[in-house]
Swiss-Prot record:
This is Transmembrane and coiled-coil domains protein 2. Residues 83-94 have a biased composition (Basic residues). The modification Omega-N-methylarginine is found at residue 163. Residues 120-131 have a biased composition (Basic and acidic residues). Its main location: endoplasmic reticulum. It is a multi-pass membrane protein. The gene is Tmcc2.
């Protein structure tokens, strides 16, 4: 069977605290085997129960095909698991209401039991063993197996499971505990400190038949083996469901501990007793959650620092690498970044979950986990099997005649009562809420509603053996007391009966198998519809996932293209900025050089102007001095002036002559070659001038002899 969506959501919230999930799945075939052994022992032990009794009939209705029983057990077990998981979300009810309900049930039981107390058998009984039945007299009892009433009484007289108690045991040790004797106390269990209060009538019968050998009740023992196997099957299913349950859901299962707790009319309920939570436990839970929150916060900081380091390393490597290396580095960085982002998101989810749990604990206080609750239920169901074996084997002497008459009906009824309850749970949940998924949403309306209706709904859902068709808790309690009384008085009649027509139809109708098959077909149809809807949902989710993946890939491709364009544009801008900087530097150098040259030219022009002004001032001063000195001797000055002019003219002529000669000589002195040739020419002329006489003599006598 597939789990519903709410179960998966609850399992995801507590994934960090998950334990072994499939411990009890392997024990189901063993439960079927033990059930088969019990049925064979039942059929074999019938003739040996008493010499004067009739042989028990062949239990024909119990011989179902193994495949059908297996399918039925699997389907009912899964529905039982879903029902239990959603029934544990109830709120607290007051203890005064429980006490009042138990007192009303006791009063109704006493009023209904007054009709049978006048019989001779009832007068001989002790006050603790009075019977309560819907029958008018002892001879008008219906043909209901009396031992089954004792089973109902044992189940209804279970002790309350205390808050905080749990079974620290694995699935493997559960099989050994189921095989141990019912009278031997279980070792290592927290239930040793609280004794199971037995019913007063059952205690009297056990005390009366304590000395009887167990061989006289072989049929009862065989029947109880079958019933114990059914109870063990339910216990293992409950344990497996508890292991699979979400540990984050803090709920508690507590049975009423009122004055009528040990009586047979105390139905099992899911009420949590009112009272302040344990401060030490609350403080420890808050400290534990604070430590987890600090740890998750440190992990988030470490992941963020690692992501920042990756970003810095990527930027550092990307600046020093070429395009191919940048693409590879980018891919590696994106993978690391996505992984870091996923890790940080998961850590944030865990942090929010822990904060939400811390807020719930601070507001409502801590409560037990579903795993501990279901383990306590497992222990309770195992104790039920032990009490069934002890009870039926104990009153075998006075009751064995009535038991042998309905041997096959008892085995079928007990098996149906213990194993078929998950189907009744699921039917009740479906009739009240529409589906098991709506219980969490209807939790608040149940709180706001009348307390009698809430108590009736919870008691009808959580009573393990009673029928869900009772009108109220009082009727359920009266029916339970009636069945217990009929079981106590079964020595004089063929059997007892419950006061509910639903119970008679369920356990005595010949068309029970057809009804079960019809319900099984309905369950299969519902499962097929659920599978179809799940397949449609998966298909829709796959399409959405494909579409989102495609959109993400397109966006990623677009992002990569935009990033490449941005990188190209950034490189272009960087190149342009570099060129502009170079041009600005060259222009700055040019401007500085030009300004320096211009300033030097201006400075030279200013200096020349200052020199000319100075010369003019000197000339003016000289002229003034000459004018002052030549005032007395004007003629001398005139002659002197003329003489100076003549001298200047001669000097000018001389300078002209010198300049002319220099103009002739200057072309001969421009280069070194010309200077050398000019010097040689002058030397030759000097030699010729010096030896002119010899030269003339040579010319006259040698060259020109004629």
């Amino acid at each position: 069977m597939k789990r519903c969506k709410s179960d998966e959501l609850q399992q995801q919230q507590g994934e960090e605290d998950g334990a072994g999930m499939e411990d009890a799945a392997c024990l189901l075939p063993g439960a079927d085997l033990r059930h088969g052994e019990a049925s064979s022992a039942n059929s074999a032990g019938g003739p040996t129960s008493d010499a004067g009794a009739a042989v028990a009939p062949n239990p024909g209705p119990r011989s179902k095909p193994p495949d059908l029983k297996k399918i039925q057990q699997l389907s009912e077990g899964s529905m039982f698991g879903h029902g239990l998981k959603h029934l544990f979300h109830s709120r607290r009810r007051s203890r005064e209401r429980e006490h009042q309900a138990s007192q009303e049930a006791q009063q109704q039981q006493q009023q209904q039991g007054l009709s049978d107390q006048d019989s001779p058998d009832e007068k001989e009984r002790s006050p603790e063993m009075h019977r309560v039945s819907y029958a008018v007299s002892l001879h008008d009892l219906p043909a209901r197996p009396t031992a089954f009433n004792r089973v109902l009484q044992q189940i209804r007289s279970r002790p309350s499971i205390k808050r905080g108690a749990s079974l620290h045991s694995s699935g493997g040790s559960g099989g050994r505990r189921a095989k141990s004797s019912s009278l031997e106390p279980q070792r290592g269990s927290p239930h040793l400190l609280r004794k199971a209060p037995q019913d007063s009538s059952l205690a009297a019968i056990l005390h009366q038949h304590q000395g009887r050998p167990r061989s006289s009740s072989t049929t009862d023992t065989a029947l109880l083996l079958a019933d114990g196997s059914s109870a063990y099957l339910l216990a293992e299913e409950a344990e497996s469901i508890g292991d699979k349950g979400d540990k984050g859901d803090l709920v508690a299962l507590s049975l009423p501990s009122g004055p009528g707790h040990g009586d047979s009319d105390g139905p099992i309920s899911l009420d949590v007793p009112d009272g302040a939570p344990d401060p030490q436990r609350t403080k420890a839970a808050i400290e534990h959650l604070h430590q987890k929150i600090l740890k998750i916060t440190e992990q988030i900081k470490i992941e963020q620092e690692a992501r920042d380091d990756n970003v810095a390393e990527y930027l550092k490597l990307a600046n020093n690498a070429d395009k191919q290396q940048v693409s590879r580095i980018k891919q590696v960085f994106e993978k690391k970044n996505q992984k870091s982002a996923q890790t940080i998101a998961q850590l944030h989810k865990k942090l929010e979950h822990y904060r939400r749990r811390l807020k719930e604990i601070e507001q409502n206080g801590p409560s037990r986990q579903p795993k501990d609750v279901l383990r306590d239920m497992q222990q309770g169901l195992k104790d039920v099997g032990a009490n069934m074996r002890a009870g039926i084997s104990g009153f075998g002497g006075g009751v064995v005649e009535g038991v042998k008459g309905s041997l096959s009906g008892l085995s079928q009824a007990t098996h149906t009562a213990v194993v078929s309850k998950p189907r009744e749970f699921a039917s009740l949940i479906r009739n009240k809420f529409g589906s098991a998924d709506n219980i969490a949403h209807l939790k608040d309306p149940m709180e706001d509603g009348p307390p009698e209706e809430a108590a009736r709904a919870l008691s009808g859902s959580a009573t393990l053996v009673s029928s869900p068709k009772y009108g109220s808790d009082d009727e359920c309690s009266s029916a339970s007391a009636s069945s217990a009384g009929a079981g106590s008085n079964s020595g004089a009649g063929p059997g007892g009966a419950l006061g509910s027509p639903r119970s008679n139809t369920l356990y005595g109708a010949p068309g029970n198998l057809d009804t079960l098959l019809e319900e099984l077909r309905e369950i299969k149809e519902g499962q097929s519809h659920l599978e179809d809807s799940m397949e449609d949902l998966k298909t829709q989710l796959q399409r959405d996932y494909t579409y989102m993946t495609q959109c993400l890939q397109e966006e990623r491709y677009r992002y990569e293209r935009l990033e490449e364009q941005l990188n190209d544009l950034t490189e272009l801008h960087q190149n342009e900025m570099t060129n502009l900087k170079q041009e600005l530097a060259s222009m700055e150098e040019k401007v500085a050089y030009q300004s320096y040259e211009r300033a030097r030219d201006i400075q030279e022009a200013v200096e020349s102007c200052l020199t000319r002004v100075t010369k003019l001032e000197l000339q003016q001063q000289q002229q003034q001095v000459v004018q002052l000195e030549g005032v007395e001797n004007a003629n001398a000055r005139a002659l002197l002036g003329k003489f100076i002019n003549v001298i200047l003219a001669l000097m000018a002529v001389l300078l002209v002559f010198v300049s002319t000669i220099a103009n002739f000589i200057t072309p001969l002195m421009k280069t070194r070659l010309r200077i050398t040739s000019t010097a040689l020419l002058l030397l030759v002329l000097f030699l010729l001038w010096k030896h002119w006489a010899s030269l003339t003599y040579l010319l006259e006598h040698v060259l020109l002899p004629s």
